[in-house]
Amino acid sequence: MYKFEIDAAAPKSELYAELVRSADALTSGEPDPIANMANIAALLWEYLPDVNWTGFYRVVDSELVLGPFQGKAACIRIPFGKGVCGTAAQTGETQLVEDVQAFPGHIACDANSASELVVPVMRDGTVIAVIDLDSPSLNRFNAEDAEGIETLAAAISGRI
């Protein structure tokens, strides 16, 4: 059993540093990537304010396949280059979207989502998954959130 003391009201830099430490503790010694993604998705869901979906899409062949998540049921498969997640997977670059309605080709898995942050998880220079965060609020995510999730993605890349 894991118990974490994470102050969701702390400055974002502190919050993300603690999330990375907690994710490390949760995944340390566990070889199963699905179990590790499930715990990380739950950790993000519990401690990130104002989110309505947290989770992973895994790279399988040339598309993204739904992985462990928290939130409403989601799209199961996303082709590379389609929507925010597919764009992140294809480019290998973080996608910070303040208003999903303004994103060309946005895939609306949850009509309540207004903003989105998608960060590629890289291993040996190749995208192996993406971390997807959705919020019902416009402009929920900023560069500090992107940096925090990018740090998390780098920290867990060998465990998922």
Regions found by a protein language model. Give the residues of each.
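Intrinsically disordered, low-complexity terminal regulatory regions
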Residues: M1-P68, A155-I160
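Juxtadomain coupling helices with adjacent low-complexity linkers
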Residues: Y2, S135-I160
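Short loop/turn motifs at secondary-structure junctions and domain boundaries
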Residues: L48, C109-S113
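Regulatory sensory and allosteric helical modules in signal-transduction proteins
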Residues: V59-C109
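Sensory-domain boundary capping and coupling elements
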Residues: M122-S135
